């Protein structure tokens, strides 16, 4: 199954803290980074390793090192930026591609307004990051862009996912694995996840949430 709900106790605890209405912007932002790092740990478990001999303190020693495709992290603006530092804390050499998506609040369809992708995507593994996987429109559109640019290995990291969004992404891109900290109940009539986290972008950046 291409969707992985991470049940680690630390992940469950931190997502529980993020659900609280009274949590501060500072704490929400820090937790988004921390859960982003934990999701990265899970999503990278099958990365290839090679060996090399280095000079250690007591002489030559064989060590392991990452081997294979380089990584590009792809935050979906703006909320995806809230997870970026957490991902880069584990993969600091990764290059960052940026995709801006805006959702039509009436049709719930996603529209791309910004696309800044790194080069040689055919030789890179892409980690798309976005706190919320709701309808799946923004995620599908971003995956479409990456595949069109030549990227063939793509993984999605989200804090909370709705069943509707998971189904949409799996139908459109069955080869893309989704790593999520929680699978929630459903979407409401406005396309927001219930119980969800609220508007993740507003909660990360401290801007006013829509009623």
UniProtKB/Swiss-Prot annotation:
Cofactor binding summary note: Binds 1 Mg(2+) ion per subunit. The magnesium is bound as Mg-PRPP.
Binding positions for 5-phospho-alpha-D-ribose 1-diphosphate per the UniProt entry: 78, 103, 130-138, 199
UniProt entry tagged with the keyword Flavoprotein: no
Residues that bind uracil: 193, 198-200
Swiss-Prot/TrEMBL catalytic activity: UMP + diphosphate = 5-phospho-alpha-D-ribose 1-diphosphate + uracil
One example GO MF annotation: uracil phosphoribosyltransferase activity
InterPro entries named in the record: PRibTrfase_dom, PRTase-like, Upp_B, UPRTase/APRTase, Ura_phspho_trans
The protein's Enzyme Commission number: 2.4.2.9
Regulation: Allosterically activated by GTP.
Pathway this chain belongs to: Pyrimidine metabolism; UMP biosynthesis via salvage pathway; UMP from uracil: step 1/1
Enzyme class label: transferase
BP term (GO), one: uracil salvage
Signal peptide residues on this chain, from the entry's feature table: none
Cofactor(s) needed for function: Mg(2+)
Keyword vocabulary terms for this entry: Allosteric enzyme, Glycosyltransferase, GTP-binding, Magnesium, Nucleotide-binding, Transferase
Source domain of life: Bacteria
Gene3D superfamilies tied to this protein: 3.40.50.2020
Alphabetized Pfam families for the sequence: UPRTase (PF14681)
Entry function: Catalyzes the conversion of uracil and 5-phospho-alpha-D-ribose 1-diphosphate (PRPP) to UMP and diphosphate.
Family, similarity comment: Belongs to the UPRTase family.
Descriptive protein name: Uracil phosphoribosyltransferase
Source organism per UniProt: Hahella chejuensis (strain KCTC 2396)
């Amino acid at each position: 199954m291409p969707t992985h709900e991470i049940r680690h106790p630390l992940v469950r605890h931190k997502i529980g803290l993020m659900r609280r209405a009274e949590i501060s912007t500072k704490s929400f932002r820090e937790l988004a980074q921390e859960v982003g790092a934990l999701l990265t740990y899970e999503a990278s478990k099958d990365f290839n390793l090679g060996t090399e001999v280095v000079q250690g303190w007591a002489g030559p020693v064989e060590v392991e090192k990452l081997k294979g495709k380089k990584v590009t992290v792809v935050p979906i603006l703006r909320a995806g930026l809230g997870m970026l530092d957490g991902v880069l804390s584990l993969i600091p050499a990764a290059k960052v591609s940026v995709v801006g998506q805006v959702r039509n609040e009436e049709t719930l369809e996603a529209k791309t307004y910004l696309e800044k992708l790194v080069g040689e995507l055919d030789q890179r593994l892409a980690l798309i990051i976005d706190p919320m996987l709701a309808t799946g429109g923004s995620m599908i559109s971003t995956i479409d862009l990456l595949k069109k640019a030549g990227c063939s290995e793509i993984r999605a990291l989200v804090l909370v996912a709705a069943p509707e969004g998971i189904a949409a992404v799996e139908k459109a891109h069955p080869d893309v694995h989704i790593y999520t900290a929680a699978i929630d109940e459903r979407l409401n009539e406005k396309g927001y996840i219930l119980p969800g986290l609220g508007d993740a972008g507003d909660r990360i950046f401290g801007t006013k949430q829509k009623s």
